[in-house]
Design a protein with these regions (language model features):
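Single-stranded nucleic acid-binding surfaces, predominantly the OB-fold ssDNA-binding core
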Residues: 1-151
């Protein structure tokens, strides 16, 4: 009997958040066609949030379908807010192409979009994942439920 194929295990570093989707595009390469986009993730206090840009490559057929369905709304400059999980974070630098800061370099984080928790177009929730990661409402705090044998 042949030896069973060993399943490769990985250490995962994932980023979970919400942010605005923009610049959806399909890219053709030697590995086939895939979808890329930009997520400007919200970070900081809810009354004075700042943004962190992520240049993402969409992973998986279901996520690709969901992001491609947002193309029209994004092209028409509607606000598309998504709940997401990213993986495979890498630092990069990009150059601003337009505006008063055109030509200036800015930091960027590249990542793979591995899960879409929800999609909101304007004020309308248009998609919620069947097993969405529940994000507590801003300002709410769940009671702490400690294990009796906590460290």
């Amino acid at each position: 009997s042949g030896s069973a194929q060993q399943k490769k295990e990985y250490f995962n570093l994932n980023v979970t958040g919400i942010g605005y989707l923009s610049s959806i595009r399909r890219v053709n390469s030697g590995n086939g066609e895939f979808t890329c986009a930009v997520i400007n993730a919200l970070t900081g206090p809810t009354d004075n949030a700042s943004y962190q840009r992520f240049d993402i490559t969409v992973a998986g057929p279901e996520n690709t379908k969901l992001i491609n369905r947002c193309q029209k709304a994004v092209d028409e400059e509607e606000k598309v807010l998504i709940g997401f999980v990213l993986s495979g974070l890498k630092a990069d630098v990009f150059t601003l192409q337009s505006g008063e800061h055109a030509g200036e370099a800015r930091p960027s984080l590249k990542a793979r979009l591995i899960k879409v928790d929800f999609i909101k177009k304007g004020q309308d929730m248009v998609y919620t994942a069947p097993n969405a990661t529940q994000t507590p409402e801003p300002g709410s705090s769940a009671p702490k439920d400690y294990d009796p044998n906590s460290f």
